[in-house]
From Swiss-Prot:
The keyword Transport applies. The lineage of its organism: Eukaryota, Metazoa, Ecdysozoa, Nematoda, Chromadorea. It comes from Caenorhabditis elegans. Belongs to the SEC8 family. Transmembrane segments: none annotated. Keywords: Exocytosis, Protein transport, Transport. This is Exocyst complex component 4. Pseudocoelom. GO terms for biological process: chemical synaptic transmission; exocytosis; Golgi to plasma membrane transport; protein transport; vesicle docking involved in exocytosis; vesicle tethering involved in exocytosis.
Length: 893
């Protein structure tokens, strides 16, 4: 550079090779020089060295000439470079001189500072001491004001600032001011306010975590209570005041102010307790305070509900109030759980504890157990067991009232129970669904199954309640079935009292199954016991009403009852006969269905009962003619009414039981379907490995079988009465009596009316129709059937038979409100005897063939021949005419 700072032109114009090119050029020149030196030193010949020397000299001269030419060509640039070099050299010299001067000045300063160092050090020490004294005095003043400052911050609920003040004061007392005498009073005062601060923080947390969630739900009740009742209770009055002031709404963590209070409180506790042990101790203490507050709030909740429902000593609550209480407690615990869940997140972050929610639900379970125990009347049972267990240990002294006795030494025995209704084990029905949801919520929150509350309820249900229900059911069913009024027919009701009582028991058990669905299998087993006992009892009742004939071959047959078995009972007990009769159309028509017509024609009724009449006449016709006696009949109308009531009661009972089973919830049905049971019946038969619904259905079907037997027995019995009264009409008798009909017809009509009067108010219309429909067809068939046993009939006897048929028809029509046209056929049968001789009967057979069967026409012809004075004594007269009749009938076919 020159003096003006400009860059030399020649230097700027010169071409500078690239670094790679310069490296290659230098490498080539160096290699050439080394080769020359090597050749000069290694050449042995002098001539060769001379040649090399001359070549080098030539090259040197050429290089010198080239340099001179270049210098000459760039003379101006060279001069500028030299000038620039001289300028730079002069500047460097000046800088070196100035640096030398600075070095000399620094040496001078150093020497001067070393001279004043001792004086400055002395002054610095004096200043530091003065500053330290001032700071100590300021800290002492701050420490003296710390108690009042802490108290002021506590009153403003600025817990974090108060905790910081406590920490700073402790650090001063235990640190810089530890050697200062006379601070013990201040230290004690600060510790006292520290305890107050901790208590205040814990109270605030308990209030936000427990009190406010509980009171939020109580405020809704308080708003509905009249003012004069609110003023009677201090707690209700305080809640009402909160409600009016608007401060009764529960704080939520979503609320910024509430969250800041919680965060401030937790951070304050974290500041106050430095060690993990101290923090855990305070969290445990906080949870214990929360547990005590839960117990207190439950008592307050019961008080508020009592006042709201106007419950006092003169007006007891019921299970509805208990259900409302448990629902309210469940809602309160849910609200408190939400608060604890969000509080637990802060505690885990600040204090390192993860069991806040778990601890809360443990306390909640304990509190719920107390409430449940007091309302289920569990404690008296436990106290009774304790009394029995400690009866042998008699106390010599009592210390409850001594001065050294603890305040809560006997609190458990004198604590007022927080109950809203009369304690009873059956209260579990209304509260178990709520408890079940609480148990599920608890297990979900504490991640433990089963929870303590579930174990408590399981112990109560399995060890106490099920056994109590079983014992009470046993005693109640004993009273329902063994009492004198159990099987006595009521005058204004068709259902037996025992049936209604047992059904009520079954409804109670079904209510238990639905309410306590987790133990549905246990209560369903009790249900089966009730049904089995009832089936055994009804079987005994039916057996007593239908005794069997004693077996003469038995040695103790004389000691057996002498009451004979009735024909209807024997036929009903016969499986083949009963199965046959129940397979007939009239039996199926007895059950009302949408396909059953409301009103049937006489033709339909006759067609339904035609086959039955044939069966009865075929089995009972000859016996009735020869050996049927009044002892074969049921003549006591109370028994008749009892059979009807038993049928209707058991049918009604079976339908109700099926409806109870059908109304069970789906989850209960699914549980019972997987529960297998074994049932022992009265006859020793076992219902083994059946599901509960199947076993119940089996018991119901067995009861229905008894009911069907009762109805079938009534159906057969009234027909046996017809056989009994109409069979004697076939015997010879004096026709000189002036009575229109024979006494047997009158007796039959009387029996039919008695049957109808006793059955019409008990049996349903369809069942009543089953009993009486077809009697006209049967009586008509009996008149015609017994005509084969009638002796010679005079004209008066013929008329008498016609009047008997008409008398039966008249009496039966009054009952059925139908003409009973089948008896018109019987009357027409005997009318043919009045108007025709045997040959005349043969003449009209083609006309009457459709009205009577071939057998009946044979009966008619035989009776006509027997009644004819001339033909009755002629040998072969009947056979000849029977051949003619058969010929006519064959031609008709």
């Amino acid at each position: 550079m020159n003096e003006n700072g400009a860059t030399p032109v020649a230097a700027a114009r010169r071409h500078r090779p690239l670094p790679a090119e310069r490296a290659t050029s230098n490498s080539n020149e160096t290699g050439l020089l080394i080769n020359v030196i090597r050749s000069l030193t290694s050449s042995v010949s002098e001539d060769q060295r001379e040649v090399e020397k001359s070549r080098l000299e030539k090259g040197y001269k050429e290089s010198g000439a080239l340099i001179d030419r270049l210098v000459k060509n760039h003379q101006q640039d060279v001069e500028k470079c030299l000038v620039s070099f001289r300028d730079v050299s002069s500047k460097i010299s000046n800088c070196r001189e100035r640096i030398h001067n600075v070095r000399n000045a620094l040496h001078t300063v150093k020497s001067l500072l070393e001279l004043r160092r001792d004086d400055l050090k002395k002054l610095w020490h004096e200043n530091a001491q003065q500053k330290s004294v001032c700071e100590i005095m300021a800290k002492l003043e701050e420490l003296r004001e710390a108690p009042s400052k802490i108290e002021n911050l506590i009153s403003k609920e600025q817990y974090q600032q108060a905790a910081d003040t406590v920490t700073e004061s402790r650090e001063l007392i235990n640190g810089r001011l530890s050697r200062v005498e006379g601070l013990s009073h201040l230290s004690a005062e600060i510790e006292r306010f520290t305890k107050i601060l901790i208590d205040k923080i814990n109270d605030t947390l308990v209030n936000m975590l427990v009190v406010e969630p509980f009171e939020k739900h109580l405020l809704h009740i308080v708003r509905t209570i009249p003012e004069h009742r609110i003023n009677q209770n201090a707690y209700c009055h305080s809640l009402s005041t909160k409600s009016r002031s608007g401060s009764g709404s529960v704080s939520s963590f979503s609320d910024v102010s509430a969250k800041s209070r919680i965060v401030s409180s937790v951070e304050a506790l974290s500041t106050l307790f430095r060690t993990v042990e101290e923090r855990h101790w305070d969290v445990d203490r906080l949870m214990m305070l929360g547990k005590n507050m839960i117990d207190k709030m439950i008592v307050n909740t019961v008080q508020v509900m009592k006042i709201g429902a106007n419950i006092d000593e003169s007006n007891e609550g019921d299970t509805t109030h208990l259900k409302q209480l448990m629902q309210l407690l469940s809602a309160q615990f849910d609200s408190a759980s939400q608060q604890h869940a969000e509080f637990g997140v802060l505690v885990e972050k600040q204090l390192g504890r993860k069991d806040v929610v778990t601890s809360f639900w443990r306390s909640a379970q304990s509190a719920i157990e107390v409430v449940v125990s007091e309302h289920l009347d569990i404690n008296p049972l436990l106290e009774k067991q304790n009394v029995l267990g400690t009866a042998s240990r008699k106390q010599l002294f009592r210390f409850e009232n001594t001065a050294c006795a603890t305040p809560n030494a006997n609190s458990s025995s004198h604590r007022t129970k927080a109950v809203i209704c009369k304690p009873s084990a059956y209260n579990i029905k209304v509260i178990f669904p709520i408890l079940s949801r609480l148990m599920e919520t608890t297990e979900k929150n504490i991640n433990d199954s089963p929870c303590e509350l579930r174990r408590f309820m399981h112990s109560f249900v399995m060890e106490v309640f099920v056994e109590r229900v079983k014992g009470e059911l046993a005693s109640r069913i004993e009273g329902a079935l063994r009492g004198g009024e159990a099987v006595r027919v009521s005058t204004n009701k068709k259902i037996l009292p025992s049936c209604e009582k047992v059904l009520n028991l079954c409804k109670e058990v079904q209510d238990l199954i639905v309410s306590i669905d987790l133990y549905a299998d246990r209560f369903a087993a009790l249900w089966l016991l009730v049904l089995t006992d009832y089936f055994k009892n009804m079987t005994d009742v039916y057996d007593r009403m239908t005794p069997k004939n004693p077996d003469p071959s038995l040695p103790n047959s004389e000691a057996l009852p002498t009451r004979r078995q009735k024909i209807s009972a024997a036929w009903t007990a016969d499986d083949d006969i009963s199965r046959l009769l129940m397979s007939l159309p009239n039996w199926h028509a007895a059950s009302i269905s949408p396909m059953t017509p409301a009103v049937e024609s006489e033709l339909d009724v006759g067609e339904r009962n035609k086959r039955e009449s044939e069966i009865l006449i075929g089995n009972l016709g000859t016996q009735a003619q020869n050996s049927l006696s009044e002892s074969d009949l049921i003549t006591d109308m109370n028994d008749i009414k009892m059979f009807a009531s038993l049928h209707e009661s058991l049918r009604w009972f079976s339908d109700e039981i099926r409806e109870l089973v059908h109304s069970l919830p789906a989850n209960v049905k699914m549980m019972l379907d997987t529960c297998m049971v074994q049932v022992r019946l009265k006859d020793g038969q076992m219902i083994d490995n059946n599901s509960v619904p199947s076993a119940i259905e089996d018991c119901v079907r067995r009861l229905e079988s008894i009911a069907d037997s009762c109805l079938l027995l009534l159906h057969i019995e009234i027909r046996v009465h017809c056989f009994f009264h109409l069979a004697p009409l076939a015997k010879y008798r004096n026709t000189s009596s002036h009575n229109e009909v024979d006494p047997e017809v009158v007796a039959l009509g009387k029996d039919l009316h008695q049957f109808h009067d006793n059955l019409k108010d008990v049996l349903s219309p369809a069942k009543l129709s089953y009993v009486f429909d077809g009697l006209g067809h049967l009586c008509a068939s009996l008149f015609i059937h017994y005509s084969q046993f009638m002796p010679r009939l005079t004209e008066a006897a013929k008329k008498r038979v016609c009047r008997n048929v008409w008398g039966v028809q008249q009496r039966l029509s009054r009952i059925t409100n139908r003409r009973e046209s089948d008896l018109d056929r019987a009357r027409a049968f005997f009318d043919l005897l009045l108007d025709n001789t045997p040959d005349g009967i043969l003449a009209i057979v083609p006309e009457k063939r459709s009205q009577f069967t071939a057998t009946e026409l044979n009966y008619l012809l035989a009776l006509s021949v027997r009644s004819d004075k001339t033909l009755a004594s002629q040998p072969g007269a009947l056979e000849k005419r029977q051949m003619v009749l058969n010929s006519i009938l064959n031609q008709k076919k």
